[in-house]
Each structure stands twice: as C-alpha cells, then as structure tokens.
Amino acid sequence: MSQQLWMERQKAFTGPPQLTETTTTANSRKTMARRSRTKTKLFFLLISLIAFLAFVPVFAPLPSFSSHYSLSHRHQHRKVVTSTVAVKPGSFEIDDDKFWKDGEHFRIIGGDLHYFRVLPQYWEDRLLRAKALGLNTIQTYVPWNLHEPQPGKLVFEGIADLVSFLKLCHKLDMLVMLRPGPYICGEWDFGGFPAWLLAIEPPLKLRSSDSAYLRLVDNWWGILLPKVTQFLYNNGGPIIMVQIENEFGSYGDDKAYLHHLVELARGHLGDEIILYTTDGGDREILEKGTIRGDAVFSTVDFTTGSNPWPIFKLQKEFNAPGKSPPLCSEFYTGWLTHWGEKNAKTDADFTASALEQILSRNGSAVLYMVHGGTNFGFYNGANTGVDESDYKPDITSYDYDAPISESGDVENAKFNALRRVIGLHTAASLPSVPSNNGKMGYGPIQLQKTAFLFDLLDNINPADVVESENPLSMESVGQMFGFLLYISEYTPKDDKSVLLIPEVHDRAQVFTLCHSKENSRRPTHVGSIDRLSSKTLGLPNAKCASNISLFVLVENQGRVNYGSYIFDKKGILSSVFLDGRILHGWKMIPIPFHNLNEVPKINAIIQVALSRSITVSTQTGLKDKSGNVSEVPAFFTGHFFIENADQIQDTFISFSGWGKGIAVVNDFNIGRYWPSFGPQCNLYVPSPILRHGENVLVILELDYPSPELVIHSVDHPDFTCGSSKSK
C-alpha cells in the first residue's frame, strides 16, 4: 500500500477538521489550487487525445452481417423451430449463437474440397462421396494465380471453372463456404497470389493496406466477386458465407487492410451475406486477425485433439453477443507432407473422437480436408522453418490422409470412423456410400531417350532470351514456373575454380562446356547447389583453349505459401562469384513447360522432344565414357496402349529407381516426381487424362534415369520411397 493511500485512509477515520477563520482561508486557497490543477489536466488530456487520433486510424463503422433483419425477425426464428411461423426461404443468418437456415436451426458439418485439385470430370464423384460421409457444406479456396496467371489474362475454364463447380454444388444440395483470399495459404504456390506480383517495382507490401497492393486486389475481386454474386444463398444459390483473407492473425496486424477487404466484399456482395474470418484459437492471433463485433463472424481453427470448448469460449469474445455459434472452420483430418519427410498420417479413431467432442455439444466443424486431391503441374506450395533457407517444398500428392483419398477411395478406417460420428448427430439417414472407383495397372512402360534438354535450346524463341549484366529472377524475365537456364562465360585457369551462388531459389544444376574440344556439343554436369545446402561448388580444371561456358539450370520447386517468407522470388537472386570475383554477362533462357491452367494445352517443347525421338537418339550417345547413363537433363518418352474403352481407369505411374523430374501424360502435367528423396514414389493419373488406344508419357529427368529405362503403371499409391520410408 502506498504512503499516499495510507494517509488518505487515516484522514477518513479522524473526522472533519474544526472550521476556523484560518482553516476557512486555507480551504479557499486549496479549492482554487484544485481548480487550477483540473484545468491543467484537462488541457493535457485534450492534447493527448488529439495526438492519439492523429496516429491511430479511426474506421467508419462497418455494416453488420446481420443488420438486414430486425429483432422481430429473430423472434420468428425461435417460433419457426416449432413450425408455427413461415419464414421466407433463402435466408442464412446467425442469432442466439446458432446458425439459422430458412428459419430453421442449422449445424454446419462441412469439408474442404478444392475444385482446382480435382479434374472437373471427377467433381461430382467427390462431392457425392463427401455427401455420403454426412457433410452438408463444402468449403473451397479460390486461388488468384490459377485464374489470372498473367496480368489481365483470365482463366475460368477447365479445372478453373469455378462457376460450374458452384452450380454442381447447388445441384447436389451442398452449401458452400467460399474463401476468395486474396491470400489463401492452402499449401498452394505463393499462397494463391499470382507470381507476377513479385516482378512489380517497387516491391509490393503483400497482405497489407499498401495502396499499390490494394489496387490490384480491388481489380481482382472486381472480376471475381461479380461472378459469384448469383450463387449467394440469399440469391437462391449455395454460398452461405464468404471468408475475408485467411489466418491473417498469424501473419500481420493491419486493421485498415481487413476493413478495406470487408468494405470491398460488401460493395460487390451486398449486406446479407455473412463474411467470416478464420484464425488460430489464440487470443493474440485473434486480436490481430479479425474485427471485433458483428462486421464479420470470427471463426477458429486449432490442433485436432485440443479441448475445443475453451477455444469456442474465446471465439465468443470476438463476436457480438448472440453472434458466435461455435465453429471450427478447419478441423484437421490429416496433415501435409514435404519432400524428404515421412508421409503424414493421423489415427482414424483419434480424429473421430476429436470431432465427437465438437458435435456432441452442438458445435459445427469443417473437415480440412475431406478430400485433398493433387497438386498437378507446378502449383505445389512450400514452407520454411526457422529461417528462409530452411526450405521445405510440398509433394505432388495432396492426399492429406483425408477420409476421401487422393484417388477418391472411401473404403478406409478414417472415412468409416468419421461417418459413424457424424451419423450420430444427423437427424436424417446418411446416403449410401459409393464403392471405390476402379484402378488399373497397365504394366511396364519402356522409355527411350528422345532428346537432351540442351539439344532443344535452338528451338527456343530468340525473343524470349533475356540478356543482363547480372542474373535476374525468374519473375523478372516472365518465367513464373518451372525452369530458367542461366548462361555465362569465364576464362579457365590451371587449377580448380570455386563457384559461389549465395542465394538460389531453389535448386541449381551446374554444367560447363569447353567449345574448343572435340565432341563438345553438350555441357558436362559438375554438381548442384540448392537452397538448403552449401552454396559453393568446385569447377574442375578443363584445360580449355577458349572461354568456358557456364550453364546454371535453376528449378522453381514451389513458392512458400505460409509465414514471414512468402515474398519468395525464384532463380538466382544474388551475384554469382567465381574465385571471389563477380561473374558478369548473363543470358537467361526460359524453358517453356506449361502449367496446369495454360492455354493452348499443347506444350511446344514436349512436341519438339517427341518429334526428335529418332534423330537425336541415333545421332548422340546416350551414355558417358564409363558406360553409365549420363547425368544431363533429358527427355524420355514412352507409349502404352489401352485396347478397350472400358479398361480406361485411374492409374499410378511408379518412378521407383529414377531420380527427379516432371511427368506429362497426353499433354497433361501430372506433377513432379522425386523418389530418390521420397516419400512419394507414384504419381496419380486420373482416368479422364487417359484415352482409348495410344497414350503418350513424356518425362524430363533432371538427375539420373533408371538403368533399364522402364517405369511401371500400377493400381495403387506408394509413399515408401527415399530416405524417409513410411507405410
């Protein structure tokens, strides 16, 4: 207790002093002094308030997600439960800490299923399986980079046909929670941002109220949101909620940014749709990631197996009174897997028990994922550890150990366990479970080397070659995915040289070529430098009479999609040093592989490789001097036949025994393989990619092919390859 407080309490017990002339005069002086001090305090308080308002943003009130209906309407809800009052259909609202659909109490039992990870021909199949699990809602991201891969180049067809996906959800009576970003995370390249944002100068401040960034977001949402307005529930469609950003509290603290997104969404979607945020169930994260009150509905996610109810109690603090139905908007059924790790698995009964904790007390949950699908093309994301160099790219499969497997299988323990729990909390009987789709192994496929990558450089359009004094990033030369070849020259010396590339994203294969030597048509592999390991490489003494050409082939293995290092440019991002001196004079040659959503679908470089299947293989040696298949990036092609149309079924291509590369089946990029690192051995090939008769497989092997030059088409997945073997 302070001395001042102790003295004040003592005075209270001694009673008032006797009033004399002296004490009266003294009291008068004290009164005047108090008035003077009061005026001084008010002056400084006013100055402090002005300073506070000058530096702290004051936002205009945001519209409530429930402001369109009145208290009398809320009372109607309670009556409708007993079917005494009819309510206009097409309303999805929150009141009394519950969801209300057309006036009826409603519980969300949903699941994430991303249309861009499943071929359109299989959308209905996967949705019906989700429905058989007992789900009533589908949640999906919308990746900006899929729909606008180049500035102003819009793609809303094929696997990017969001409108058709929404129509199908509506047809199957599945509600939708839409997550349009602009940032989505989702183990998707760059968190869904288009890579061309990285080429803008000065650099954008992503996920912020930076005006340059917001102008681009305004433009993108100005294209996207009008397309989905007709599908809002209040307009007769399936969309019941639209998410603002994604787990923003784990990244930043910029309320002006969140307010801008809310106002932008309201401007396009109107005041009736519920806007929501998703953040981890932590007070500090929620403070930064959402907006208190009823402008948005704050939802939470948390580790599966955590006690959900203290987190739901915390959730209520960030929502307006009566506006916080408990909802875990990402209930994790499994987890992601990086290259070099064991395949992530979670126990079926443990997962089902965790879901039971939520549903048993009338909570809602969205399974992340109900069906993972596949990172086709070059769209896999990546994570970092303690720093930017601790780089971990995701595998091609996004199976996620979800109840519906990558290939759609449902005959598994997790599907059954979750369905049993959901069935206990669903009034209507669940739909019957479809059987697994058929799988077919088409056997061994003999490959032949058709062309070395370097042999095809003459087919690159000269206008696409960029020259610069110093290396440029992939984004700066317009190569957003795949590979970029850097070429320079240096003067040889008598002993070895040391090459240093301080910053390369993500993996560089180094080759040299002495033009004065006989049979020097093709560069020789020297070694590799990557983001994780040593940045130096010894270059052998070539004893070359001319300058030596240095070739550095850089692979973009997937941009970081989460955390502080999402501004993840690719290519050589620093000077290149040779024996301590900067190497100048560079050519950069894009290697034009198509990504998932590119038009036209025919890949020019693949067609060139196929056309040279005879001439190149006969004119050039396939092996080095020691008789081994040379470690130079090369194209291999193979053919397999499907005799009858009814034999066209899903298959898996096994790359066991091969090194690292990409695979294309019938001009469709099925993704990356890396069995030498693991754990994924086989790539999934959905049946719609295949055709009756001849099917063509083309692979670019970067490291070393199997000596037999054989791969196998099998009827099952396999995640037991590499040093991190797992069943």
Language-model features: locations:
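Aromatic- and glycine-enriched glycan-recognition loops and surfaces
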Residues: 114-133, 151-170, 494-503, 529-535, ...
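Short, low-complexity, Lys/Arg-enriched N-terminal segments of secretory-pathway carbohydrate enzymes
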Residues: 1-39
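Aromatic-lined substrate-binding rim segments of carbohydrate-active enzymes
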Residues: 122-191, 195, 262-272, 387
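Extended substrate-binding grooves/exosites of carbohydrate-active enzymes
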Residues: 82, 87-121, 128-132, 158-165, ...
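Short, well-ordered coil/turn segments that N-cap beta-strands
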Residues: 107, 134-136, 170-176, 233-240, ...
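Aromatic-lined ligand-binding clefts that engage carbohydrates, nucleic acids, or primary amines
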Residues: 496-514, 550, 640-666, 673-674, ...
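Gly/Pro-rich turn-and-neighbor structural signature
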Residues: 236-323
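Carbohydrate-binding surfaces of carbohydrate-active enzymes
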Residues: 6, 12, 41-48, 214-228, ...
